[in-house]
């Protein structure tokens, strides 16, 4: 359970497992910092496939990530594995307007 960073040649993938809440803030920020250090030309994705709970602080973390990524020229961020409760929260919060939901 927790947050980890996966990398491929053309993108960074932040994988979140379990509860995505304020307890994950530091780990998420560390992964995001590392992903953004790789450069603005690479893609960025967040894999939420294994998230079973999502709270408002997680939404805030995603918005901060979007702002920081945009400042580096990353315009497209995909949220992967959005299903059930997680997808419902993201759609109700209009995150489908800010991110690609898959």
Description of each model-found segment:
Residues 1-15:
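Short beta-strand/loop segment at the start of cytosolic alpha/beta domains
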Residues 4-6, 80, 100-102:
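General small-molecule cofactor/ligand-binding pocket signal
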Residues 19-99:
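Amphipathic alpha-helical interaction surfaces in cytosolic regulatory modules
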């Amino acid at each position: 359970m927790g947050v980890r960073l996966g990398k491929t040649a053309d993108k960074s993938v932040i994988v979140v497992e379990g509860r995505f809440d304020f307890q994950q803030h530091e780990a998420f920020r560390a992964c995001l910092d590392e992903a953004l250090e790789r450069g603005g030309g690479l893609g960025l994705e967040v894999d939420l496939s294994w998230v079973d709970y999502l709270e408002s602080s997680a939404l805030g973390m995603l918005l901060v990530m979007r702002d920081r990524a945009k400042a580096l020229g990353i315009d497209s961020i995909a949220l992967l594995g959005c299903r059930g409760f997680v997808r419902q929260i993201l759609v109700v919060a209009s995150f489908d307007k800010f991110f690609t939901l898959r």
